[in-house]
Structures are given as structure tokens and as C-alpha cells.
Design a protein with these regions (language model features):
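Hydrophobic alpha-helical connector segments
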Residues: 2-44, 94-97
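Phosphate/oxyanion-binding loops and surfaces in catalytic or ligand/nucleic-acid-binding neighborhoods
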Residues: 7, 36, 40, 57, ...
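Short amphipathic alpha-helical interaction patches enriched in hydrophobic/aromatic residues
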Residues: 12, 16, 58, 82, ...
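An amphipathic alpha-helix signature
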Residues: 27, 31, 71-79, 118-125
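Helix-loop "lid/cap" segments that line or gate small-molecule binding pockets
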Residues: 31-38, 46-57, 81, 123-127
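Amphipathic alpha-helical packing segments from all-alpha helical-bundle domains
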Residues: 39-48, 58-85, 95
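Hydrophobic alpha-helical segments that form the core
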Residues: 45, 52-53, 76, 88-110, ...
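Short terminal or interdomain "cap/linker" segment that borders an active site or interface and mediates
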Residues: 115
Length: 129
């Protein structure tokens, strides 16, 4: 679990977020993060497999999701991106953005079907008040 989080943490270390971006630019930033994280396809697939394997073990499952060591830094990064895009209640929306990115990442890791992450993220960000 820690090794998976360490890899994700390395993906976001030293990431610079401009002070102000459009919602489309924010989506592009998030897509860049998603694409960078997706390069570790084996780690993402292993995490997905563990999630299914541990679905009945709340404590261990949470270490891969809500309580993962990287979750707080990812949520903080999402909040910074949302703030830069001028989105109200950024801190309230940040966990949802992290969840959406995680879902897109898992979908890609599973090779479920083609999905246009940029379109999905732009639509999500445009829909926020």
C-alpha cells in the first residue's frame, strides 16, 4: 500500500499550478496528471486488483482509497487547481475531483473501453458552480 502511494506522491511532487487558469486549462492540467499517473500502469492495475480483493475488508480497503497516504496531498492539489480556476467551494469539490480522476485512472488501467478523459474532466469542471 505504501509503495503504491509513494509512486503516486512522486507523480505530483513539485507540480506548479498557475495562480489563475480557465476551467479548460484546469482540465488540461488534471489530464496531464492523469496521464503521468497512468504511465505506472502495472501499479494502477495492482491497486485495482487489490481494491476488488479487499472489498469486504474495510480497514485495508480504506488504506488504498480514502486513507491512502497520498490522498491528502492529491486532495490539496485538486483544491489548488480548482481555486486557480476560480471555482467556488474548491475545498468541498476537491475530494470529488480526486475521485473522478481515480475512477478514470482505474478505467484506463483495466482497459475497460476508450474514454476521453479531457472531455469528461472539462464537462465536470464546467458544471461546477
Amino acid at each position: 500500500v505504501n509503495r503504491l502511494s509513494e509512486g503516486s506522491q512522486a507523480d505530483i511532487n513539485d507540480l506548479e499550478i498557475p495562480a489563475s487558469v480557465s476551467r479548460q486549462e484546469a482540465a488540461d492540467i488534471v489530464v496531464g496528471i492523469l496521464e503521468h499517473m497512468a504511465r505506472r500502469a502495472d501499479a494502477q492495475a495492482a491497486r485495482g486488483a487489490l481494491l476488488f480483493e479487499l472489498r469486504d475488508d474495510v480497514q485495508l480497503r480504506e488504506l488504498l482509497t480514502a486513507e491512502a497516504p497520498v490522498r491528502q496531498p492529491l486532495t490539496h492539489l485538486a483544491e489548488r487547481i480548482l481555486l486557480a480556476a476560480g471555482i467556488d467551494q474548491a475545498s468541498a469539490h476537491a475530494p470529488d475531483l480526486v475521485g473522478l480522476v481515480d475512477a478514470l485512472l482505474m478505467y484506463q488501467a483495466a482497459k475497460a473501453a476508450p474514454v476521453n478523459a479531457r472531455k469528461v474532466l472539462r464537462a465536470y469542471l464546467e458544471g461546477l458552480d
